[in-house]
Amino acid sequence: MDLVEKLKNDVKEIEDWIIQIRRKIHENPELSYKEYSTSKLVAETLRKLGIEVEEGVGLPTAVVGKIRGNKPGKTVALRADMDALPVEETSDVEFKSKVKGVMHACGHDTHVAMLLGGAYLLVKNKDLISGEIRLIFQPAEEDGGLGGAKPMIEAGVMNGVDYVFGIHISSSYPSGVFATRKGPIMATPDAFKIVVHGKGGHGSAPHETIDPIFISLQIANAIYGITARQIDPVQPFVISITTIHSGTKDNIIPDDAEMQGTIRSLDENVRSKAKDYMRRIVSSICGIYGATCEVKFMEDVYPITVNNPEVTDEVMKILSSISTVVETEPVLGAEDFSRFLQKAPGMYFFLGTRNEKKGCIYPNHSSKFCVDEDVLKLGALAHALLAIKFSNK
């Protein structure tokens, strides 16, 4: 029996077990940096499987499992993120979130369950492993700022790793379909804040003021022109202003106005140009109207997620032995799995969960987000298959 058929048979034994783990985590979602129950479940499950466990790797809720083969080989890292979102679940499932205002609306519950399933398969087939398989259960991917990957890397989780892989469940693709691409697959999220300092006064006498709201509107229109007139239209790129705050009363022109938003890009040159254009636009418009301004970009945001081309070619061939594999367009969402890919070659890929018959049609981050649980065994199978194949390279 070849490796694929062996793993397919093995995963049938634990399909229901994987689903039950997923449902338990789904019922008890935890926000970024607070994944205490989830990490406890992970550590206990790994220990029951006889896997070496290290807790608190860079963050209190981070967990790392290590499976060592019987002969020298490569070190392969597999990653699952664990945190939920501040979303009130409105889906009607029997294992609905028990925590008010918190939901696994991005499928990280499935990521944990699939990697635990992969761990089971790897232990059962330990004689096929060379080197080491490192199981990374990461907190705080949804943080959007520092994120959980960076402190884990600083604590040494990627030391000696030769390859790294990560799966994300997605309703953008049909159930059971793997989707990935060579090169940039997800964007970098440059969060920005613009503050306009004007001079307040009475709403009936705007000529005696420096109106920060009026100036902010001019800035907003000009910023949206960056996409239309400054960036090559074939480049995936977007700017969104997502908050504008100013003022307290209908007859008072305020002193200040504040805008926040995000720039998403897949190219470092485009990213740099856009930030430079924004600074110049804000400075120029504020100068024209006599205001002062601040433009701040969040530091050390998630990098662009870049799949290694050679590894991706090989992985797509391997995954095609267990399901359909398609090449996807880049996604302008962001992922701190990108930090792992800066430390070792690897690949990030999606596993489709869209199933209209089961009502699994809502996008990630929706309060009605739904997962076709039939695909979870595929995720576990993919983890184990890639780990074994690449540990023996």
From Swiss-Prot:
GO terms for molecular function: carboxypeptidase activity; hydrolase activity; metal ion binding; metallopeptidase activity. Zn(2+) binds at residues 104, 109, 245. Homotetramer. This is Thermostable carboxypeptidase 2. Belongs to the peptidase M20 family. It comes from the Archaea. It comes from Saccharolobus solfataricus (strain ATCC 35092 / DSM 1617 / JCM 11322 / P2) (Sulfolobus solfataricus). The active site is at 302 (proton donor), 373 (nucleophile). Its cofactor is Zn(2+). InterPro entries: Amidohydrolase (IPR017439), Bact_exopeptidase_dim_dom (IPR036264), Peptidase_M20 (IPR002933), Peptidase_M20_dimer (IPR011650), Thermostable_CP (IPR053493). Can release basic, acidic, aromatic, and, to a lesser extent, aliphatic amino acids. One of its GO terms (biological process) is proteolysis. PANTHER family: METALLOPEPTIDASE, PUTATIVE (AFU_ORTHOLOGUE AFUA_6G09600)-RELATED, PEPTIDASE M20 FAMILY MEMBER. The keyword Repressor does not apply. The keyword Cell inner membrane does not apply. Its EC number is 3.4.17.-. Keywords: Carboxypeptidase, Hydrolase, Metal-binding, Metalloprotease, Protease, Zinc. Pfam families: M20_dimer, Peptidase_M20.
